[in-house]
Amino acid sequence: MTAPVRDWNADAYHRVSGPQVAMAAAVLDRLRLRGDETVLDAGCGSGRVTRLLLERLPDGRVIAVDASPDMVARARQELAGDPRADVRRADLAELRLNEGEQVDAVFSNATFHWVPDHAALFARLAAALRRGGRLSAQCGGEGNVAAVHEAALAAAADAGLAARFEGWPRPWNFAGPEQTAQRLRRAGFGDVECWLQGWPVEPDEPRAYLETVCLGPHLERLDAGEHERFLDAVMARLGAHPVLDYVRLNIVARRGGSVDR
């Protein structure tokens, strides 16, 4: 199952994504890199975290992929001139590297929850990894920003826009650790560890952050002329300085034996 590609504002995301950069530090640490590996950055966004990954690979390289054309363009701009960075547009659920190409490790930050089919996702990542290769990832997990989305739907009612969200198939997949571990093992991973971690976020630019990071799918349900009314109602619900209830799903695993490519 392939999700429609979100129309991200990559420049805005690059500016407001400080919390995602902070979240990435421990995920990078868990890769335990030597510095000469080839690493897949699965969902590179605007390239801010890819640059941090490259700092750990003085003699290695990164294949950075993202489904969003705007994010890919911004990442190429961010990483221009670095021969270790290969930025490509790709849907992770349908990911296929070049013929005969595999990576030593997979890194991903704040991406997997945008992929509806995690079984397909993990199968494609396993196929991209060499045997024994390590996966270190973090994404939105079960309960992630639940209060934010509850406030957003209440705000839509406040703004007279509730009908736009009737029967809405929400586009994110905030999975739990147990089901994620099962899917990873079925895809050919071993040494699997998955756990949830609360991570409250107090963004520096709350309105811009919510508009860019959290509420993009909501805004796509509305006409352009309704966006500001909806955002006004959301901010009235959350307050001027909200603390957002992030819950992160941490994933560590190692690719086991042979898998179908």
Give residue spans per PLM region.
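Conserved class I S-adenosyl-L-methionine
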Residues: 1-37, 48-52, 71-74, 134-159
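C-terminal helical/coil "lid" or tail adjacent to the Rossmann-like core of SAM-dependent
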Residues: 187, 191-242
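Class I SAM-dependent methyltransferase SAM/SAH-binding core
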Residues: 40-42, 46-95
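A short glycine-rich, Lys/Arg-flanked "PGG" loop and its adjoining helix->strand segment in the class I
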Residues: 119-134
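Short alpha-helix
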Residues: 172-187
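A short SAM/SAH-binding and catalytic strip from SAM-dependent methyltransferases
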Residues: 105-118
